Each structure stands twice: as C-alpha cells, then as structure tokens.
Amino acid sequence: MINGVIFDMDGLMFDTERMWATFWEPALAALGLEYKEGLAEAERGTAGETSRNIVRQFYGEDCDANAIIDSLHRVADEEFQKPVPKKPGLDELLAWLDANHIPMAVASSSRVHVIEGNLNNWGLTHYFKALVSGQQVKHSKPDPEIFLLAAEKLGTDPAHTLVLEDSYNGVRAGAAGGFVTVMVPDLLPADDEMRGLYTMECTNLNEVLAKLKTGEL
C-alpha cells in the first residue's frame, strides 16, 4: 500500500528538462566557453558537488566549475520567471492523492526558489507537505539522500512510498533507497539498467493515476 508520494520536478511535473538542455550553451558562452556534446545529458538530475564534478570531467579539473554553474543558474532564473508547461495528468493526479489523504513531497535537484516558483506559478504549493531541494542534501541523485529526507518529512516508510521519476539518476536513487520507484520517461527512454531497477514504467502521469486507482501501485 502506498502511504506517500514523492515527485521529482523537472521532466516529471513540468516540461522543463528540454529547457535546461538549452540553458547550457548561453551559460557557457557568457564565460567564453563552447558547449561540449553530452554535457546536458550527463548533468540531468544532478546538483551540488556531483554537478560540479561533471563540469570538471568535461572542461578539466582546473576549470571554474562554480562560475559555470552560477552562469547556468542565471540563465535559468531568467527563463523560469514565467510559468513553465505542466505535464499531462499532473492536476488530476495531485487532486486524487489529496482527496485520498496521501501526503506528497517534491524532491528535486533544482534550487528551493525554483521549486517554489514553479509551484506558485500554477497554484500547486498547497498540495505538498514537504519540498526538498538538492541544496539541502550533501549527496545528489543517484544517491538516495534527497528521497530519504523527503520520506522522513512525510513520515513514511520508503517501502511504502512511491517515487515518481523521469531521469536515470532519479530512478537509481529511488531504487537505492528502497522506494517503490516508477519511471515516467521524458527525454530518454528506459534502458535495460532502468528496467532492472524500477518497480514499474508508466507512459505519463495519467497512467500512474490509473495504476493507483486499480491498486497495481
């Protein structure tokens, strides 16, 4: 039985993963650097030192990873001032979980003000008992720390807590934490590794809701 639900944000609740992929080029250009193929994909779902280490892998150990990430965040902050597109089925899923008194949390690698801004822009904040940002944990996805903290705030056992994720790192984190992990693919389809980790794959949030209603989740 599912006693709580933890939502990833980018690419799961909102169609923002595509946006993040476009932020890297102008962010790097502002520092006189060129975008290197594969960076956006490698960075997907990460935060903090994990994110900076990936930057160093692409631009060398001596690069100013902090400056690069700060530049990325400046581009993102400007773009996220306006409402971003919601994923199909989000409203219906939130309303059903709320009506059935199942507590919800957001656990996202994004910064706190970005999470709050996206939720506030659509009037969704009231649905969530907890918001956990990548800024609040030492280890980012694929480490399960962010999901474990969210479950602690919800007061639920990971074994009975549903994690909804679109990214590979997110699925890895959910599985590592012992959560009921459902992948809802966005930019990347599930591969053999993901199929070996997740509990179930759903094509969209409408299907997640249908599985909850029938008790398959």
Per-segment meaning from a language model:
Residues 23, 36, 63-67, 84, ...:
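Short linear functional motifs in flexible/disordered or boundary regions
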Residues 25, 33, 74-76, 105, ...:
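Homeobox/homeodomain signature
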Residues 34, 103, 180:
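Residue-level detector of anion-binding/catalytic polar loops
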